[in-house]
Each structure stands twice: as structure tokens, then as C-alpha cells.
Amino acid sequence: MKQFRIRKDDKVMVISGKDKGKIGKVLKVLRKKDRVLVEKVNVAKRHMRANPYLQQPGGIVDKEMPIHISNVKVMCDACAKATTVGYRYTEDGKKVRFCKKCNEIID
């Protein structure tokens, strides 16, 4: 199984594509498709049918679409840069992610 260095609720920056440079929070990681849903990034218009049972009106709705995981990088809170994530073990044996630019622990 592949190891994903991006997790839900991470702050990420888009590094390529039409939304290059935008920063957002990861809403969902789609592991089977190698994609992530990022808040307010790669937004498309979708036509929604009205659902009277759930009191949902119909119309055109903006919806976030998945973006490939290779097109985003994790933002480090300490150095405020888009960075590659590495893994290491702490003294007590716990595996943690760290920023490869400033060596600060991310989570």
C-alpha cells in the first residue's frame, strides 16, 4: 500500500495547474485515485436536481473537485513554506512527520 504524506485537515499549497499558488485545507483524501479534495480549490459548477424530501433546492452549485496528490505540497506552520514531508521516530518511539526545510515536527 502506498504511503500518503498528506492527511485530512492539512494545510496545503497547489504547486501546478490552474489554481497554482492557492492555499487550502484538505477536506478528504481519495487513496484509491491518488487525489485530494482541497477547500476552495479546483471549483467546478454542478447542476443539482431539487430533492423535495430533503428540502434541497435545485440549481447550479459550486463544488470542489479532486486534484492529484502530486500537485499539492504540505504547508509548514513554522517556516510558512510549501515543503516535502519526511518521517522520523521520536525518543519514545512514536513515528512523526517533519518539515524537510526547517526540521520542525508537523503533527
Swiss-Prot record:
Superkingdom of origin: Bacteria
GO CC, any one term: ribonucleoprotein complex
GO terms, biological process: translation
SUPFAM superfamilies found in the cross-reference section: Translation proteins SH3-like domain
Pfam families for the chain: KOW, ribosomal_L24
Annotated Gene3D superfamilies: 2.30.30.30
SMART domains registered for this protein in UniProt: KOW
Described purpose of this protein according to its UniProt entry: One of two assembly initiator proteins, it binds directly to the 5'-end of the 23S rRNA, where it nucleates assembly of the 50S subunit. One of the proteins that surrounds the polypeptide exit tunnel on the outside of the subunit.
Full protein name: Large ribosomal subunit protein uL24
Taxonomic lineage from the root: Bacteria, Pseudomonadati, Thermodesulfobacteriota, Desulfovibrionia, Desulfovibrionales
Subunit structure as annotated in this protein's UniProt entry: Part of the 50S ribosomal subunit.
Family stated for the protein in its record: Belongs to the universal ribosomal protein uL24 family.
Key words, A-Z: Ribonucleoprotein, Ribosomal protein, RNA-binding, rRNA-binding
InterPro entries for this protein: KOW (IPR005824), Rib_uL2_dom2 (IPR014722), Ribosomal_uL24 (IPR003256), Ribosomal_uL24_CS (IPR005825), Ribosomal_uL24_KOW (IPR041988), Translation_prot_SH3-like_sf (IPR008991)
GO molecular function terms attached to this record: rRNA binding; structural constituent of ribosome
